Amino acid sequence: MQKEELTRDPNLTNPLVLAFLGDATYSHCVRYHLIAKGLVKPNQLHKAANRYVSAKAQANVLLTLMPTLPEEELNVVKRGRNAKSGSSAKNADIIDYRHATAFEALIGYLYLSGKEERIAEIVQQAFAIVEGES
């Protein structure tokens, strides 16, 4: 898959745009992970994916990882957390929703920055955190 070249500086990109991209990137990683684990029934996949992508799960992942994030990534997290979204959380409290947005913004920022190895590292940590909850 060929990526189009972006000339936009990820540091100047609206954090909600970063979160939009991060949501898609993280969801893709989750779905691939679940299929690799052997889940093939659509209903099973949907239920299992929700366990990873819910606002509550993403907030927990972010709060667990925050003490280990470098300053550059923490700045992105703060921008994402403080971004004013036009929508509200459907099935989450506002605090979890904001932290989930911050997590997605971080993933989007890393994607736009071309830091795919760092995304893989964070995603693997996220999977371990979510799977350790059961």
UniProtKB/Swiss-Prot annotation:
Its EC number is 3.1.26.-. InterPro entries: Mini3_fam, RNase_III_dom, RNase_III_sf. GO terms for cellular component: cytoplasm. GO terms for biological process: rRNA processing. It comes from Brevibacillus brevis (strain 47 / JCM 6285 / NBRC 100599). Involved in correct processing of both the 5' and 3' ends of 23S rRNA precursor. Processes 30S rRNA precursor transcript even in absence of ribonuclease 3 (Rnc); Rnc processes 30S rRNA into smaller rRNA precursors. GO terms for molecular function: ribonuclease III activity; rRNA binding. Belongs to the MrnC RNase family. The keyword Ion transport does not apply. Its main location: cytoplasm. Its cofactor is Mg(2+). It comes from the Bacteria. It is an enzyme of class 3 (hydrolase). It is found in: Cytoplasm. Pfam families: Ribonuclease_3 (PF00636). This is Mini-ribonuclease 3.
